[in-house]
Amino acid sequence: MKFELDTTDGRARRGRLVFDRGVVETPAFMPVGTYGTVKGMTPEEVEATGAQIILGNTFHLWLRPGQEIMKLHGDLHDFMQWKGPILTDSGGFQVFSLGDIRKITEQGVHFRNPINGDPIFLDPEKSMEIQYDLGSDIVMIFDECTPYPADWDYAKRSMEMSLRWAKRSRDRFDGLGNKNALFGIIQGSVYEDLRDISVKGLVEIGFDGYAVGGLAVGEPKEDMHRILEHVCPQIPADKPRYLMGVGKPEDLVEGVRRGIDMFDCVMPTRNARNGHLFVTDGVVKIRNAKHKSDTSPLDAECDCYTCRNYSRAYLHHLDRCNEILGARLNTIHNLRYYQRLMAGLRKAIEEGKLESFVTDFYQRQGRPVPPLNVD
């Protein structure tokens, strides 16, 4: 992988990630394909929304279908027939999400398989091996996602262990002869001094890109913005910056304003299945009765298949009848909305008009622009 940085506007960056499998224009949003599918979508449909890279889930694909079945097909690209690049998370966040049924030690994480209850163990080395078999174009180190809230002492211990795991991840990744990209993950909760130590330690190990982890886990938005404002300038400018698990459209806008290049989140797909649709002027809750006889498109400014062909009334009808097509059409729209938003941000950065774009984005939704505390 090669990262090319074209231009900046304030702290916002316009660039691209270049892979053997294709080019990803940045800032970029990555749809999430947890089990080897972006829920309800074919790879061709995902590509038609404008997505150039997707995310796969190491933890879930390890449990089902497992490494051996994956290798029978080649790798994850062959298994799911996605031709572009794939980023896989390390499994750390999913293990964190297991709560009481897992035990974290210096060696790794002991837990029970949520499918059948069998005891199972995951460590940095195993995570690197699974992601190698998946053929991931971007591999994430195995870390502990520090919960929120966490006091300073706990956050420090967690961050320091994640640094040790980062070195183990790097060593095993190199030992496998993996020629793809490996990203480090910055931890430290909401504490700037801990984030400083994490960034410094990761840069000393050396990675192809750096993710900001441990955000969007319940902390106030002000804390997320503050940490991004503090951390992003410390990440080497020639490396991509990835904000993990984020988020709402406004979170993408605020991340870009602070220097983030990459995002992923289940929100556009999950919300689509619940009839919660993102449009230029905000949000449409399509199951509400007011849409029952509305013949207008979901978003007059959207060029997606759904908006070009169907009315709000039809989408409302499908949702009320629990028709599978409704979830699919909603997903197509939400994914396209996110890609249109990213394309708009990229164009605004190119033209040096980002703050004008941001102002218009919030004005259309009747909301104030959040403060930006950067030099």
From Swiss-Prot:
Gene3D superfamilies found in the cross-reference section: Queuine tRNA-ribosyltransferase-like (3.20.20.105)
HAMAP family (alphabetical): Q_tRNA_Tgt (MF_00168)
A GO CC term assigned to this protein in UniProt: cytosol
Superkingdom of origin: Bacteria
The species this protein was found in: Citrobacter koseri (strain ATCC BAA-895 / CDC 4225-83 / SGSC4696)
Biological process, per Gene Ontology: queuosine biosynthetic process; tRNA wobble guanine modification; tRNA-guanine transglycosylation
SUPFAM superfamilies recorded: tRNA-guanine transglycosylase
Residues that bind Zn(2+): 302, 304, 307, 333
NCBIfam families: Q_tRNA_tgt, tgt_general
Function summary: Catalyzes the base-exchange of a guanine (G) residue with the queuine precursor 7-aminomethyl-7-deazaguanine (PreQ1) at position 34 (anticodon wobble position) in tRNAs with GU(N) anticodons (tRNA-Asp, -Asn, -His and -Tyr). Catalysis occurs through a double-displacement mechanism. The nucleophile active site attacks the C1' of nucleotide 34 to detach the guanine base from the RNA, forming a covalent enzyme-RNA intermediate. The proton acceptor active site deprotonates the incoming PreQ1, allowing a nucleophilic attack on the C1' of the ribose to form the product.
Annotated keywords: Glycosyltransferase, Metal-binding, Queuosine biosynthesis, Transferase, tRNA processing, Zinc
Family: Belongs to the queuine tRNA-ribosyltransferase family.
Presence of the UniProt keyword Thylakoid in the record: no
InterPro entries given in the database record: ArchSynthase1/Queuine_TRR, TGT, TGT-like_sf, tRNA_ribo_trans-like
EC number: 2.4.2.29
Protein name: Queuine tRNA-ribosyltransferase
Upper classification of the organism: Bacteria, Pseudomonadati, Pseudomonadota, Gammaproteobacteria, Enterobacterales
